[in-house]
């Protein structure tokens, strides 16, 4: 028991060191996934010996330990393969090599510099969805690891896999879920792809899709019109300016608000914590409130942070266990809440304690019990 505890402690310290280092070297990320693999191997061994709590942490089930360890092994092997190619000298961040991004479409590929495009279903800008076009996609093909860019046409978003156009987002399938007329518009930063209203939903199969390709690595657009049966050509037009996205201009505060507080998104640059990628302030609370910080991120990372916070017990009043919202499908994102006696103590905590850049920091006020 003591040996397992010591090894787990050393392993989690290694993981936290990787978070705090925030390296851009692929070798450091290989070491990170090795540490994650060892962590879940230790958890697995503990669970096999009927140990449910280790270092004041709940030990995951055998199935979870096995799945997490396998994911870590998969990422470690993939990164080791990349490290033997010409791409090893590029910048690689924790986000670029995280498991969540690895399993995002296109799956089992490394992806960098995603840019959002909007698809309006039924021609209604209020019925739109955002999709990601990746500037760089790294995939393991027949000739080893290759680097390509995403492309966009009326049919969907794709990349070239060993010379074959491979779609990872099909707009027709999305239209069946979100639209009624099977007609949609694709809106990018400076151009849009339209389909005339007269085009039948079945006509698109009689001819090749419109070949409007937007290569995001050089912002070069090549357009060739595609003829639809019984209708005029699909049209591509350039917009005079970028329309603000709903996600940018109207942040969804329902997930960020807490204890009857109203949340407003505010970017704070290097004030309270220069390592926090985004800090949201919460205001307009009642009179009897206490300052809090919500830390949002992957559950295991938050557990490691909470474990390290034990060194700074004098800098906060209390800290919760990890939890998540039950009304969302994103169960991978968890939260812990830290309570303070006043804002001075909270500011001291932010200045002293180093929080990993992958963890989102949300300032707020919480109603006193």
From Swiss-Prot:
Organism: Human papillomavirus 66
Processing and modification events after translation: Phosphorylated.
Cross-link (Glycyl lysine isopeptide (Lys-Gly) (interchain with G-Cter in SUMO)): 296
Family: Belongs to the papillomaviridae E2 protein family.
Region (Transactivation domain): 1-200
Annotated region (Disordered), positions in chain: 230-257
Keyword set includes Magnesium: no
Protein's UniProt name: Regulatory protein E2
InterPro entries associated with the record: E2/EBNA1_C_sf, Nucleotide-bd_a/b_plait_sf, Papillomavirus_E2_C, PPV_E2_N, Reg_prot_E2, Regulatory_protein_E2_N, Regulatory_protein_E2_N_1, Regulatory_protein_E2_N_2
GO cellular component: host cell nucleus
Subunit architecture: Binds DNA as homodimer. Interacts with protein E1; this interaction greatly increases E1 DNA-binding activity. Interacts with protein L1; this interaction enhances E2-dependent replication and transcription activation. Interacts with protein L2; this interaction inhibits E2 transcriptional activity but not DNA replication function E2. Interacts with protein E7; this interaction inhibits E7 oncogenic activity. Interacts with host TAF1; this interaction modulates E2-dependent transcriptional regulation. Interacts with host BRD4; this interaction mediates E2 transcriptional activation function.
Keywords of this entry: Activator, DNA replication, DNA-binding, Early protein, Host nucleus, Isopeptide bond, Phosphoprotein, Repressor, Transcription, Transcription regulation, Ubl conjugation
GO MF: DNA binding; DNA-binding transcription factor activity; nucleotide binding
Subcellular locations according to the entry: Host nucleus
Pfam family, one: PPV_E2_C
Compositional bias of kind Basic and acidic residues: 245-257
